[in-house]
């Protein structure tokens, strides 16, 4: 390392400050500084000289480091890194500040040394929800072990080539004897009893030590993507650089320093924090004390929040003191997070409701800003029902004064006053005076953004614990057992005033009527995108029914032996599972056993059978999946959440039940996931009318979904009621669900054509019956759902639960929850109107268990009326068997929370719950590039709502990703044996290199969007182009080899098709395949069965239609690739399924090593590669001029939980209003997606558009006929093909929206007014003769660049002038479409040059039609290809992920 170690800190601080101070004129210089920082940190991280020393080579080749296996060297390196971390923390900080909290910290350390040893933990404590604190080893023994580490022999050096088996055993024994033991008191170990509902004895025993250590490894694991020590160092140094005079100090790091001093002793090389991680972030373990890992996690999370949410505290002394107080409290009591959260629950709900004279002072009082300034929508009217087809924001202005004082006083009831008083006392009782002072600021009404900032600062601290993990068996039993008893009482009629008979007296007929009417509406074609498919259509679409969000399956384990190696695949891919099962997946018989507890089942057996089964269970000769199949039981999974919440159960639906639901209720879900096709006639869902209540009718990925509620809060004249029910699924009784299904059956039987000749599923227990009709499937599913038993498993402990309620893994969970919630809401609204001054409901919405109701507030003037509304709401939910907390049923005219969307006085904000470093579970990615691209998506999403500086936060994310981006590379000798392992870091520009380059991560430089090709071209190309050649070499090919090899194996008889598939060089000969699965439906299968199922689903009529269309197109000189032809759909589907398989990491983690190793000897100059080589459309675009603009919109800022630059964008451009571009959340057309989904195609929307352009059908004399033939060749379906062709011809002007939403959707520009008429204020496209639609696309390209510049200009707005290279555009257009024979004949042999200054066109014989050079772009232009966008392909919402 060129720098002396003592110089690293001041040098890095200087570099960071230069970057922070840079502006748009200094972008490239700032990036050069960033690359220097990355170089210094990488060298610091790896502790040895790299094998590529020249800086130019570093930029082109990356860095190589030898990987040491010497434990002493590794220990010394990490000790030095920890020492640097502590020196950085203390750098230029006065000693009194450093030692300010030493007494508290030493008390924390003393407590850690006095908690019980692990063997003193009682059985009850071992089973607690939160892992109890305990010691693993005393400090003296730990220090001795650290010394022993240094003398442990290197196992790899002892291996001899001719070593015998006995020598190996002796060597292993020596190794075990010399290896340190990190758990003291093994002689005190004992066995504890755990529950096991799948054993005859209902229990089993295990060692206490094993159980506690297994819990520790599971519940303390943060699932990082890189080692946390470099992350701590980077976060701290950036906080230092960003804070005033570099004086920031972390008492979390101070705690770590004192712990290292205490347990490491005087030797520097033993002073490492006793938590172990691998270089890839894998959790290895902890030493001495159980809760060191969670404390390290809290410290890293705390520093990250302070950096990325810096605008909340602005490094002010009071806010930092509050943060330190809470952090030290949690370090002292790491299991008290739930208690802290509970202490402020109601302050979190009823903030800013107390109206008093200070509220109208419009100034700063005691340091609190009471200035009245917020967005208001003056046109919002809630005196009558609001019935929008599409939710969107209206124009907002800035409100400077109160106009609704009556409601201000009415909502602050005595009950609410009591809640707040109790919470303030709770905080005081925790001995947190600074926090008490902070939360006291949340009581008074402050109608501006500062109260949201104060609330967010509190919530940030509540999220310090990251993802909370606990003993899920304990958590589940506590919740489910209590609810099960409550449900049984309700079902038995124990309470004569609240029971199932009273509920179903009104709910059952209403449910049945809704199911009946919506089914009839679908059958009669009222909802075009919802229909009941034929059995062949259903089977051909089966891959779309089993999406990533659908039913759960057990692991499918596949062993694939090729002529070169053996691959192991472990997957939960539903598509792979279906293709392995074939038609067996449609057989309900294996999952139709009556659910029984094991003890009950054994009683039904003869003594001999019972004894044999018990013996088989105890010996393990019967698998768990087979036993659960016999017992008719299903599995429960789990989800971890943040803010110390308990682990939530996820009930896993079996695939057969999921498919049954897809066939019978799937069309109902489809009817409610698309926007209204006609104006709603009322608020309510009746089946005939969808009403306005389903959130899925308005979802577009933005806050538009509840625009009416947010606007209502801006006026203060409407009353919002927010119902919060707990454990909705578990209290939604099956007895109230079945009537809806009965209504479906009733309609199907009336409309007999839908229930005849179609056999969707089979029941192999019924011989001589061809299959099950829809009405029979309804009967089967009603029987299936009446009672289930689910089994939860955790660390080998298993517990079975009887379930007579909605389970969360069902296809219809969200839909049916919404239906029942809407019906209850209607009852509430009718009673409120009757009993509370004729108060009418103006608007409502439900999203599963969430409900929001907006009432006309003109007749509300007293707290008694508000209290009455609360009582009516709570009682109606309770009478429906739901658990609702009156304290959490918020009634407010100014604030609310719904489906994780928060608002206050017309301002919108999000909870800071996204974790940057931690993950809920390990990434499913099979290589580091894929994993870090996923991490990049997390960074991007996190930074959009982090209330700090976007530039700083984006830089932070890039540095964290860059330090984690390393690849293990092996060097081989002449005999192809490994003789050295190296750690390779790609060129540092790989972090922002777009993802089209194999090793590019595509992270954002500006923070606005991913894959910022144009910005790189304009400002960073000199640096980025140096490394792109090598970055493109970093490819992980094992998954591609497996998918291609399997396709070649199973499609070996389809030689022409294989040729067209172009499987390429990544191909190996498959010699054998074996399957295993833990799923109870799996009975040993093969992918050939899935292929047979797909072949059988080919419709003969459609096949002939497809073939005829292919022939017709061929006669016009147009070829349809065989890979897309309808008759080859089964094969294409299987190949697509293989692409979902992930090879185990041991096989897939290595890249093309020989190419990379060759870089060490490569002396020739490595060529530069243009960033536009993979994105040629950007070669067309130049920014010819930039003029300063000194005007802003002058409007309000609605979106508060955004970075500083996000608010600057909103201020400059204007806040979101009106119907924006056709944003689908991921840039797709519902029409195209519906065509793909409804026909079971495997082509993506992108590929379909590309096929349309390149096929040449748009250049035919009758392009509409050509489109129909093309779509029919793919689908064989005439009706949907004609509809899509008509859509293409009719909707030409909107095709640019596809690319616009790829650019803007999900970015901060989503919060702005991005309508074209507004965009033209900031962008000019210098192409006056260009067709308007294409011109419009270039406007949006310039608009994104405008925003990127603004971010780097400190909010200074500029006008962007976009010019187009017309010669390149002409070549680009010509290259994007082949010239057909008919086109040649039409154009003639002599063509004039294309005149791009005019809208040049060819006159053709068809009346009133012309073909323009731009027509391909008007209809579906190449610009909609993925040359930019905020969604990496592997992490975007794809068609197959759409909810049914």
Curated annotation (Swiss-Prot):
Resulting phenotype, residue 426 to S: In strain: Isolate H
- Which residues does the UniProt record annotate as the domain RdRp catalytic? 690-897
Q: Name one GO molecular function term.
A: RNA binding
- Give the record's keywords alphabetically: Host cytoplasm, Nucleotide-binding, Nucleotidyltransferase, RNA-directed RNA polymerase, Transferase, Viral RNA replication, Virion
Q: Which GO BP terms apply?
A: viral genome replication
Subcellular location per UniProt equals:
Virion; Host cytoplasm
Quote the cellular component terms of the Gene Ontology held in the record.
Answer: host cell cytoplasm; virion component
Describe the effect of residue 92 to E.
In strain: Isolate H
According to the record, mutating residue 100 to R results in: In strain: Isolate H
The EC number(s) given in the record are 2.7.7.48
| Catalytic reaction(s) noted | RNA(n) + a ribonucleoside 5'-triphosphate = RNA(n+1) + diphosphate
> Region entry Disordered: which residue ranges?
157-181
| Highest taxon in the source lineage | Viruses
Q: What is the effect of changing residue 225 to V?
A: In strain: Isolate H
Q: What does this protein do?
A: RNA-directed RNA polymerase that is involved in both transcription and genome replication. Together with the capping enzyme P5 and protein P7, forms an enzyme complex positioned near the channels situated at each of the five-fold vertices of the core.
Family per UniProt?
Answer: Belongs to the reoviridae RNA-directed RNA polymerase family.
Q: What is this protein called?
A: RNA-directed RNA polymerase P1
């Amino acid at each position: 390392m060129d720098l002396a170690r003592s110089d690293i800190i001041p040098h890095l601080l200087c570099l960071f400050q230069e970057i922070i101070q840079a502006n748009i004129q200094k972008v490239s210089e700032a990036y050069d500084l960033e690359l220097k920082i990355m170089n210094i940190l990488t060298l610091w991280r790896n502790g040895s000289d790299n094998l590529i020393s020249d800086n130019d080579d570093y930029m082109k080749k990356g860095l190589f480091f030898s990987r040491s296996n010497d434990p002493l060297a590794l220990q010394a390196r990490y000790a030095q890194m920890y020492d640097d971390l502590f020196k950085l923390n203390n750098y230029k900080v006065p000693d009194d500040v450093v030692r300010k909290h030493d007494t508290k910290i030493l008390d924390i350390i003393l407590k850690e040394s006095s908690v019980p040893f692990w063997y003193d933990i009682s059985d009850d404590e071992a089973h607690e929800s939160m892992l109890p604190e305990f010691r693993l080893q005393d400090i003296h023994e730990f220090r001795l072990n650290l010394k022993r580490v240094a003398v442990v022999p290197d196992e790899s050096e002892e291996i001899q080539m001719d070593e015998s088996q006995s020598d190996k055993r002796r060597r292993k024994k020596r190794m075990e004897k010399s290896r340190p033991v990190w758990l003291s008191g093994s002689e005190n170990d004992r066995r504890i009893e755990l529950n096991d509902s799948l054993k005859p004895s209902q229990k089993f025993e295990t060692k206490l030590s094993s159980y506690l250590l297994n819990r520790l490894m599971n519940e303390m694991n943060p699932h990082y993507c890189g080692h946390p020590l470099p992350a701590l160092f980077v976060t701290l140094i950036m906080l230092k650089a960003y804070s005033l005079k570099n004086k920031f100090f972390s008492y979390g790091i101070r705690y770590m320093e004192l712990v290292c001093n205490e347990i490491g002793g005087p030797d520097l090389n033993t002073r490492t924090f006793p938590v172990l991680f691998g270089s890839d972030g894998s959790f290895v373990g902890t030493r001495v004390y159980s809760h060191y890992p969670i404390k390290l996690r809290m410290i890293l999370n705390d520093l990250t929040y302070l950096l990325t949410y810096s605008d909340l505290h602005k490094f002010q002394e009071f806010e930092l003191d509050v943060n330190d107080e809470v952090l030290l409290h949690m370090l002292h009591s790491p299991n008290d997070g739930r208690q802290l959260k509970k202490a402020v629950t109601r302050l979190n709900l009823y903030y800013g409701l107390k109206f008093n004279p200070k509220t109208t002072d419009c100034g700063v009082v005691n340091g609190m800003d009471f200035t009245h300034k917020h967005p208001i929508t003056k046109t919002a009217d809630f005196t009558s029902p609001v019935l929008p087809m599409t939710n969107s924001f209206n124009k907002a202005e800035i409100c400077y004064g109160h106009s609704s004082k009556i409601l201000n006083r009415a909502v602050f009831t005595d009950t609410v006053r009591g809640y707040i008083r109790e919470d303030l006392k709770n905080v005081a009782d925790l001995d947190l005076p600074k926090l008490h002072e902070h939360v006291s600021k949340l009581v008074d009404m402050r109608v501006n953004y500062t109260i949201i900032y104060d609330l967010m600062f509190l919530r940030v601290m509540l999220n310090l614990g990251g993802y909370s993990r606990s003993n899920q068996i304990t958590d589940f039993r506590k919740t489910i057992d209590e609810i099960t008893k409550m449900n049984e009482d309700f079902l038995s009629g124990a309470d004569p005033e609240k029971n199932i008979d009273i509920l179903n007296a009104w709910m059952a007929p209403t449910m049945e009527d809704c199911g009946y009417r919506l089914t009839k509406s679908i059958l009669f074609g009222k909802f075009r995108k919802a229909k009941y498919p034929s059995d062949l259509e259903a089977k051909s679409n089966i891959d779309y029914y089993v999406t990533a969000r659908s039913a759960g399956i057990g692991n499918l384990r596949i062993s694939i032996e090729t002529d070169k190696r053996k691959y192991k695949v472990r997957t939960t891919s539903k598509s792979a599972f279906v293709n392995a099962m074939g038609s067996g997946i449609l057989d309900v018989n294996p999952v139709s056993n009556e659910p029984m507890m094991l003890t009950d089942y054994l009683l039904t057996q003869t003594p001999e059978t019972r004894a044999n089964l018990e013996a088989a269970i105890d010996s393990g000769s019967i698998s768990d999946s087979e036993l659960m199949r016999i017992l008719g039981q299903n599995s429960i999974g789990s989800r971890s959440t943040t803010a110390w919440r308990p682990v939530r159960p996820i009930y896993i639906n079996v695939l057969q039940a999921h498919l049954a639901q897809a066939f019978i209720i799937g069309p109902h879900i489809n009817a409610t996931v698309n926007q209204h096709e006609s104006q709603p006639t009322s608020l309510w869902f009746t089946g005939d009318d969808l009403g306005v209540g389903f959130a899925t009718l308005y979802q577009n990925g933005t806050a538009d979904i509840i625009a009416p509620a947010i606007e209502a809060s801006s006026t203060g004249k409407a009353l919002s009621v927010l119902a919060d029910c707990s454990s909705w699924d578990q209290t939604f009784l099956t007895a109230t669900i079945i009537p809806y299904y009965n209504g479906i059956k009733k309609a199907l039987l009336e409309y007999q054509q839908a229930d005849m000749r179609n056999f969707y599923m089979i029941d192999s227990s019924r011989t001589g019956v061809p299959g099950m009709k829809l009405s029979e499937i309804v009967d089967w599913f009603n029987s299936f759902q009446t009672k289930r038993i689910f089994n939860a498993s955790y660390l080998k402990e298993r517990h079975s639960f009887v379930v007579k309620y909605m389970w969360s893994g069902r296809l219809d969970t969200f839909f049916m929850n919404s239906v029942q919630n809407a019906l209850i809401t209607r009852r509430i609204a009718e009673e409120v109107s009757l009993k509370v001054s004729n108060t009418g409901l103006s608007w409502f919405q439900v999203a599963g268990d969430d409900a929001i109701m907006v009432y006309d507030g003109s007749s509300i003037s007293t707290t008694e009326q508000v209290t009455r509304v609360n009582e009516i709401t709570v009682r109606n939910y309770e009478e429906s068997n739901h658990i609702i907390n009156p304290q959490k049923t918020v009634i407010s005219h100014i604030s609310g929370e719904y489906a994780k969307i928060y608002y206050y006085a017309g301002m919108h904000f999000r909870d800071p719950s996204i974790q940057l470093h931690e993950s809920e579970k390990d990434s499913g990615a099979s290589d580091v590039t894929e994993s870090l691209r996923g991490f990049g998506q997390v960074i991007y999403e996190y930074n959009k709502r982090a209330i700090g500086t976007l530039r700083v936060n984006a830089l932070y994310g890039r540095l964290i990703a860059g330090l984690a981006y390393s690849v293990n590379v092996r060097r081989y000798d002449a005999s192809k044996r490994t003789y050295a392992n190296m750690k390779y870091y790609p060129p540092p520009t790989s972090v922002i290199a777009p993802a089209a380059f194999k090793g590019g991560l595509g992270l954002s430089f500006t923070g606005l969007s991913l894959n910022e090709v144009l910005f790189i071209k304009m400002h960073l190309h000199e640096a980025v182009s140096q490394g792109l050649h090598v970055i493109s070499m970093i490819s992980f090919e094992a998954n591609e080899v497996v998918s291609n090899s399997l396709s070649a194996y199973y499609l070996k008889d389809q030689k022409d098709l294989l040729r067209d598939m172009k499987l390429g060089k990544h191909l190996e000969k498959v010699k054998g395949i074996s399957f295993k699965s833990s799923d109870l439906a799996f009975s040993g299968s093969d992918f050939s069965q899935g292929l047979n199922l797909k072949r059988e689903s080919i419709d003969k009529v459609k096949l002939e239609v497809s073939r005829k269309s292919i022939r017709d197109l061929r006669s016009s000189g147009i070829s349809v690739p065989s890979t897309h032809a309808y008759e080859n759909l089964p094969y294409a589907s299987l190949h697509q399924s293989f692409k979902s398989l992930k090879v185990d990491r041991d096989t897939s983690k290595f890249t093309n090593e020989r190419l990379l190793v060759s870089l060490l000897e490569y002396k020739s100059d490595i060529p530069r590669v243009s960033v536009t080589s993979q994105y040629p459309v950007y070669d067309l675009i130049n920014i010819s001029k930039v003029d300063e603009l000194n005007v802003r919109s002058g409007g309000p800022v609605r979106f508060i939980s955004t970075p500083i630059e996000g608010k600057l964008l909103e201020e400059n451009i204007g806040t979101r209003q009106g119907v924006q571009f056709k944003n689908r959340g991921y840039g797709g057309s519902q029409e195209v997606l519906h065509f793909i989904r409804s026909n079971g195609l495997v082509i993506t929307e992108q590929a379909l558009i590309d096929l349309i352009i390149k096929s040449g059908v748009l250049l035919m004399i009758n392009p509409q006929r050509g489109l129909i033939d093309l779509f029919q060749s793919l689908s064989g379906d005439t009706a949907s093909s004609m509809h899509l062709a008509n859509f293409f011809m009719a909707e030409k002007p909107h095709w640019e929206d596809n690319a616009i939403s790829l650019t803007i959707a999900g970015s901060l520009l989503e919060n702005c007014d991005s309508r074209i008429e507004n965009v033209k204020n900031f962008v000019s496209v210098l192409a006056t003769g260009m067709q308007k639609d294409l011109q419009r696309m270039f406007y949006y390209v310039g608009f994104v660049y405008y925003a990127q510049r603004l971010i780097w200009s400190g909010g200074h707005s500029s006008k962007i002038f976009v010019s187009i290279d017309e010669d390149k555009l002409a070549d680009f257009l010509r290259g994007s479409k082949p010239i057909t024979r008919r086109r040649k004949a039409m154009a003639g042999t002599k063509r004039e040059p294309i005149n791009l200054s005019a809208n040049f066109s060819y006159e053709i014989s068809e009346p009133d039609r012309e073909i323009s050079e731009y027509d391909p772009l008007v209809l579906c232009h190449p610009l909609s290809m993925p040359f930019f966008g905020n969604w990496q392909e592997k992490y975007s919402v794809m068609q197959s992920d759409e909810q049914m």
